[in-house]
Amino acid sequence: MTALTVPKKDTTALKQPSKQAEAILQAKDINIYYGENHAVKQLSLDINKNEILALIGPSGCGKSTFLRSINRMNDLIPSARVTGTLAYEGLNLLSDDVNVVALRKEIGMVFQKANPFPKSIYENLVHGLRFHNVKKKEWADIVEDSLKRAALWDEVKDRLHESALSLSGGQQQRLCIARTLALKPEVILLDEPASALDPIATAKVEELMVELKKNYTVVVVTHNMQQASRVSDRTAFFYNGELIEVNKTDVLFRNPEKKQTEDYISGRFG
């Protein structure tokens, strides 16, 4: 994991008890501020290897803000400030000596709105490879493998040099997922990846998420509780910047422990 740290600076390892070895990410006492706005409050949460964790809650509850903190996307917002620790394989990802470029390769993100580059399908996939100095002779295999993992290869293999903007919305979103996979991440962050898609495209993205779990850890923000119940292993409910409850998805939806959770999933507020 030395690639995640800036050379010639020390990083203090965060030793974790063996009983927590299944957790690939461990957030502890995370507070996130935008100026004076306390957006996420004292959050602690383990994210387990090869699981799909869904983050649910009403708009403005802090779920996307927390998601963006995992690979330091909040660094791009001048007023943002994050405190606490976010441990990933022994490193505190919030430390100043973390190489953020390497981090975003290791922990990739796919956004709500598909954002393919205005280039060919092929160039979308090799853009990151070129940036990270991956040998050119490896590109073709990586492109094919990534598109297959994103369940898109059969649909585009004969048009790789056509514009990515010619793809349908669902195909564009799967291309963005393939673009992330090309960099061989360990964790994939999905911020409402299907909210702008039709039901058929949504179903394909959901099927893809379940398939990805075999090789990756997936954290997905969704307003769609049915989607969370279909694809996730565990669900975390956020409200007013706080993590209210986290549990196995079927347990949380059938028998929530907190009244706020029950009120939200039953539609009493949202």
Swiss-Prot record:
Main localization category: membrane
PROSITE patterns the record matches: ABC_TRANSPORTER_1, ABC_TRANSPORTER_2, PSTB
Residues engaged in binding ATP: 57-64
InterPro entries according to UniProt: AAA+_ATPase, ABC_transporter-like_ATP-bd, ABC_transporter-like_CS, P-loop_NTPase, PstB-like
Coiled-coil parts of chain: none
Catalytic activity: phosphate(out) + ATP + H2O = ADP + 2 phosphate(in) + H(+)
Residue intervals of the ABC transporter domain: 25-265
Topology of the protein relative to the lipid bilayer: Peripheral membrane protein
Family in the record: Belongs to the ABC transporter superfamily. Phosphate importer (TC 3.A.1.7) family.
Oligomer status and interactors: The complex is composed of two ATP-binding proteins (PstB), two transmembrane proteins (PstC and PstA) and a solute-binding protein (PstS).
Function (record text): Part of the ABC transporter complex PstSACB involved in phosphate import. Responsible for energy coupling to the transport system.
Protein name: Phosphate import ATP-binding protein PstB 2
Organism whose genome encodes this protein: Shouchella clausii (strain KSM-K16)
Gene responsible for this protein: pstB2
